[in-house]
């Protein structure tokens, strides 16, 4: 086994120069350094390990080192170089798997000062250097310090422009940290049987003897790194035109809002608490006041006649009277960009906030206001005006003006290469960033059709025929309920699963919760499964917290298998639990449930356990599904990539969007995805049949 790391002059898309590389070889126990002129020898050493059937360990290798080496070998040496997936271990992938609850375990290190705040919850190699006590400083910080001492100005990224010996030293230190991290990860007995020395085995033994989750996460990371490099073809012109339309509507709304809400006076500048006139008790709910020390109705007498009252004193022209409290105010013009102004006007119109920030301010966004209704038509019109403004502002932020706006992330190839963390959530779900492609508005949302249509295989023209590619969108059918049915089957002999496949599960749930409509039942069950509180559940039928609590109670009484499942989970996790001063104090047996692939899925609280179990099951099913789909397509002789037959563009929770060179290939992808999903169900002995639905079209609007 080799542990390695490279330094180069840029990120993957712009990298052109290999600076240095380091290998730690477990066979001789030595660190081997390779400078710019040794690039060929470095590649030879890696290839020799592959030929031996060995393993090469990088940190973030799947996403950076491995594809960067392929690119640099061609650029600098005109050499074909490809490391096979099965020969590569990524400690970043392992860290995210084994320490998915890192933020919980980092608190002690943060308090003790062992871990800097900027590294809290981070899986980066530098963060692990601090945790493991192997950190010897950070190259970028030291480089900046050196420039400062020399009186030179730092330009962002310049530390990677040219090779230097300090870089070589840090490269060695990175491998020291990677080795220490690897050994820490391999010592976890849950994932790696302790009787095997995993640093002294070939790749076949490593993958077959470690827990299945280790293999699943590495395969997913490899595939999703490929998806990132593929990118999602994007219609820049269409979104620029949409931006013009949205900006015009925003200007119109700004005028309407300012006219509708005008201006008002509000307290500002008071320095003292207002006290009750009779009791003298401070009244904190009232605005702060000022109590003048000077001023009056009349000025002091300035001659004998005024003192004797024969002549009136002059009027005091000062604005205040000494000892007479007043509330200072300011004149405010409505500002639609101010959340404080918006929530003030909404509450005046009759809106009662139910969701608050950590600091106690009402949360104001288009989603929170979606269901707000008041009886007064004028006030409702005012609320609707604000709702539309917030929605327009959100669309503008997503598409054009925000830091992570789509237009800011279109690469030179006309595609958006969104970042995916394959195990970003504690449940095993992926998370998305730069930009977040999981938050593209749906086709039923305002402007959703234009947004989705901009992402599409049709925007990629084939390099040979010049024809647009075809899109295949496939999603898992009713996954949440099928996962619930799988876990309920032990308690109801598969009755719930049978109803899903052969009956009408939403009508069954409607009757169980005694809800007025089938649509209410659909909203209820998904809210229930995702851990919605009593207040949220009550809102489904236009009521509050008490009604929500009652609906849950009825549902559990009439669906005893779910109640039994919840009880079973509680018994597995919790030794004892009691409520003290409104807080649940739990004595845990253990704080994790077993995922479908054997992993530990960490649970934050007992009431979230069922939701965690179901979300994890859905995430892992889809993860293995996308892996198996690609594997089966390749087995059919199809090539993955824009230079081949199909290209993964996005995986969002339970759906994949795949670009295909022809309609025939798109049909094959849809068929194979269904076969792969059935294979996953059989592989994990799922107690409810798993299915997919596929659509073929030109873009995401047509394929979801």
Curated annotation (Swiss-Prot):
Cofactor needs: Mg(2+)
Record region (3'-5'exonuclease): 1-187
Residues bound to Mg(2+) 2: 5, 7, 174
Region (Polymerase): 202-704
GO MF term list: 3'-5' exonuclease activity; DNA binding; DNA-directed DNA polymerase activity; metal ion binding; nucleotide binding
List of residues binding Mg(2+) 1: 5
Keyword Lipid metabolism: no
Function noted in UniProt: Replicates viral genomic DNA. This polymerase possesses two enzymatic activities: DNA synthesis (polymerase) and an exonucleolytic activity that degrades single-stranded DNA in the 3'-5' direction.
Name assigned to this protein: DNA-directed DNA polymerase
Gene from which the chain derives: 5
